[in-house]
Structure formats: structure tokens, C-alpha cells
Design a protein with these regions (language model features):
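N-terminal secretory signal peptides and thylakoid transit peptides that target proteins
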Residues: 1-18
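Extracytoplasmic "Venus flytrap"/periplasmic binding protein-like
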Residues: 74-147, 181-184, 288-289, 305, ...
Length: 455
């Protein structure tokens, strides 16, 4: 039996009232009532503040974007000569940045602006580590309407805005066109996983003589990817990690979906699991297809061109229960630390809105494959140079909100990865593993949520 984290159950988490109503695609949890108790300045008070002369920006440089981030910082400093920005490498991924930001909370110096992933911004908000930025945005002359409505809506909580979208992405289906051609299958992404399962044995057979060839399909490395990308297979077969606040990881449909995943590796043998980076495996010609972030698009196409390899991209495949809206969004936003001075917070607001404006987001999108987050962004030049980018933009229209078990239960994503490791790498019994996962997620609720409930 699944646990239902209803509005009544979840009332009071860090002073927030979190509704369990269904969310629209690409939107944060619906909320009403009181928000997290943080004192913020009014628009009139912000107007009397002078921005600090120096701030820091902690990033993992998502999508290998460090050079682009440096260019954006230089452009910001040129437009705001009184403010300098110190770029801090917080780690090689979102989790490492989160750990460093959390550690900094114990000291007197915290970074002013932080890249916050889809599984971290909410925790920062309810813990009071970041500042609601509604009035800050007004103070620097920016409106939430300046952003893609679905992406900016991801960061709405307790009737307040907690972040702006930055390096936002969706997974894409990447495939080697030459491998598909050799197998005599269509040079396109499969419409469903069932269709790909029909193609896969032929694809593997036709390309197995290639040096270092492994599999027709490579599941992404489990750490950081399993909880995110496996939602696609689950949703396509009518399953999920959770439905709103109900944990459904061991429902009949979820078990069937994950059994299909295990069978593709163990019984049918046309799929494998990457030990490090599935997109690198694809670029090396070791596999014929994989799923990876749209942020990998530019680098993958560049590598393919250099290797005289034809790489195609497409929507994520559907399944027997759903053929569309089976793609999650992902990536990160920018948050402003609550522990710094108003002067630094105002300078931070100037910076985050500059690096997410139409010109800046277009530059980041062109360099990586991340989604343009500004409503006024003109992607025509990107599509002209990289036609595959249109797929990224088009797929955004049919995305689905991620399961709460991954994004809003503290540590939930790591637990999903542990379960996936057992199922995909250790050949564990699927049903019992997912039942154990459900119990673990319930335990997270009991330990990390229930103690904070209001009496």
C-alpha cells in the first residue's frame, strides 16, 4: 500500500503549505497559504540599496559551459562596471555543488548565486537557505513574464518565486544513423520502446563486428541519471516513481516497466549500462543509441562531425500505455543565497537576470543545447546552424512534470539510483527491490518530513 502525502500530511514543512493538487507540465508544486518565514525587503526598501561591488557565482559549469559562463560574466561586468563576479567551481556536477553550498551555510561566507538542480532548489527554499526573489526581480526591472512560463513556473512555491531558469534541459534520444542504416531500420528515433526492441537485435547483429562495439542501446550511467531518465520508460508503460505525493514505485505497472528494463539487459542482451558516460560511448561508436541530456547536443554533434559519424536525435520513445508526454524536464536554475547582505543580494539579482536574458540564454543554448529560458529568445540562428536543436524546442511542448519522489523527497533521487543499480547491474528481483524502495521513500517522509509538521 502506498503512502499518500496529502496537503494535510505535508502541512507545515518548514512553514510551508504544500498542495497535493495535480501540477501542470513544467510547474513547481502548487501552493497556498504562508510561505517560508524569511524577512525580505519591500520594493521601496530595495530601491534605496546600492548593489555590492563584488559577488560570487558557484557553478558546476553544466554542459561544459565554463568558457561560456566566463563570457557571460565579462558581458555582465561590461554592462555593470561597478560590479565584479567571481566564478567558483563548486564541483563537477549538481550534487557536488549542493554539498559545497550546504557546507558553506555553517560559515560566514556563502556564495551569492548558486546553480541549483531540479532536486535541490526546493530543499533550499523550505530550509531558508535561499531568498524568495519576487521583489528582487521588480527592483532590477525584470518580470517573471520575461521567461518561458513553464520553466519559470518550476520555481514557484508558497506563492513566491525562488529561482530563475538557467541551464534547463530535457533528455533526448541520440542514435547512430550509420548503425541503423546497416541494420536496415529507419534512420529515426523509435516511436515506442516496443518498436526499438524489435529493431535492437538486428542493430546489434549488424554492427557487432565493429571495434569495441558493445550494445544496440546503452542506458545512461546510473548516478545522477537513473531517477531522471527511467521516468520515460515508467510513464510509457503506465508506471511512475510516484503520483503526486503517492509513492507508486512498486505498482504493477512500475514493476512491469522495470522488469522490461532488466530483461533488455539480462535476458535479451541488446542493452547495457554505461559505467561513466553513455554519450561518450555513443561518440566512440561502442553503442548505437542512448538517452542523454539536450545539453550534450552541441558537443556530440561536433564530435560526430570530427569522427565522420552521422548522429541523429529524436523525442524520447513512448510505451504501450502512453505515446506522448513521456519526457521529463531537468537541469538547473539560479538561486540567491539568503545569508548574504541586501547589497550583495541586489547585485546577485542583477547578475542572474542578465545571464538569463534573451541574448545570454541564446548564447548558452548555442554552446550547449540547453533550452532557451527567456520568452524573447530568438533561436532562429541556432536552428539554422544546428537543425537538430529544433527537436529540443519541440519536445519541450510535450514534457511532463517529474515525479515528486525524485524532486521533492530529500535524498529521493539517490534512493532511486540505488534501486536501479540493484535491478540493472546486480540482477536483483525487480518486485522486491521496488517494494524495498517504496519503504525507503516512506522512511524519508517519516524521518525528514513528519517531524517538521505542525501540531
Amino acid at each position: 500500500m502506498s503512502i499518500s502525502l496529502t496537503r494535510k500530511h505535508f502541512l507545515g514543512l518548514a512553514g510551508a503549505t504544500i498542495g497535493a493538487a495535480a501540477m501542470a507540465a513544467c510547474a513547481g508544486p502548487s501552493t497556498d497559504g504562508a510561505g517560508t518565514a524569511l524577512k525580505t525587503l519591500s520594493p521601496d526598501e530595495w530601491s534605496k540599496i546600492k548593489p555590492a561591488s563584488s559577488i560570487s557565482f558557484m557553478s558546476s559549469h553544466p554542459g561544459k559551459s565554463r568558457d561560456t559562463e566566463m563570457k557571460l560574466i565579462e558581458a555582465f561586468q561590461s554592462a555593470n562596471p561597478g560590479i565584479t563576479v567571481n566564478l567558483i567551481t563548486g564541483g563537477s556536477n549538481y550534487e557536488e555543488v549542493a554539498q559545497k553550498f550546504q557546507t558553506a551555510q555553517a560559515g560566514s561566507e556563502v556564495p551569492d548565486v548558486v546553480v541549483a538542480s531540479d532536486v535541490w532548489w526546493f530543499r533550499y527554499a523550505v530550509s531558508g537557505a535561499i531568498l524568495p526573489i519576487d521583489d528582487l526581480l521588480k527592483a532590477v526591472g525584470v518580470s517573471t513574464s520575461d521567461y518561458n512560463p513553464g520553466l519559470i513556473g518550476d520555481y514557484k512555491h508558497a506563492n513566491q518565486q525562488w529561482a530563475v531558469p538557467y541551464a534547463r534541459s530535457t533528455p533526448l534520444f541520440y542514435f547512430n544513423k550509420d548503425h541503423f542504416k546497416a541494420a536496415g531500420v529507419p534512420e529515426r528515433a523509435p516511436a515506442t520502446w516496443e518498436e526499438f526492441a524489435e529493431w535492437a537485435p538486428g542493430i546489434k547483429s549488424a554492427n557487432s563486428a565493429g571495434s569495441g562495439y558493445q550494445n544496440a542501446y546503452q542506458y545512461p550511467a546510473i548516478a545522477g541519471y537513473a531517477g531522471w531518465t527511467l521516468q520515460n520508460v515508467l510513464w510509457g508503460q503506465g508506471g511512475s516513481w510516484s503520483k503526486e505525493w503517492d509513492i507508486t514505485a512498486d505498482s504493477e505497472a512500475s514493476v512491469a516497466a522495470m522488469q522490461w528494463v532488466q530483461d533488455s539487459i539480462v535476458k535479451q542482451g541488446w542493452a547495457g549500462v554505461s559505467s561513466k558516460n553513455a554519450i561518450t560511448d555513443l561518440q566512440a561508436g561502442a553503442v548505437s543509441a542512448t538517452i542523454s541530456s539536450s545539453a550534450d547536443l552541441a558537443a556530440t554533434l561536433k564530435a560526430a562531425k570530427e569522427a565522420n559519424m552521422r548522429i541523429g536525435v529524436g523525442f524520447l520513445p513512448g510505451g504501450s500505455a502512453a505515446s506522448t508526454q513521456v519526457c521529463p524536464t531537468g537541469g538547473s536554475g539560479l538561486v540567491v543565497a539568503s545569508k548574504t547582505s541586501p547589497e550583495r543580494q541586489l547585485a546577485a539579482a542583477k547578475f542572474v537576470t542578465f545571464v538569463t536574458n534573451a541574448q545570454s540564454t541564446t548564447a548558452l543554448s548555442a554552446a550547449t543545447g540547453y533550452l532557451p529560458v527567456a520568452a524573447a529568445a530568438d533561436i532562429s540562428s541556432i536552428v539554422a546552424q544546428t537543425p537538430e536543436f529544433q527537436t529540443v524546442v519541440d519536445q519541450l511542448k510535450v514534457t511532463r512534470t517529474q515525479d515528486f519522489a525524485r524532486t521533492f523527497l530529500p535524498g529521493g533521487d539517490q534512493e532511486l539510483a540505488k534501486a536501479a543499480t540493484k535491478i540493472m547491474n546486480e540482477k536483483a528481483d525487480v518486485k522486491s527491490t521496488l517494494t524495498e524502495l517504496r519503504g525507503t521513500l516512506e522512511g524519508i517522509y517519516n524521518k525528514d518530513v513528519e517531524p517538521k509538521l505542525k501540531a
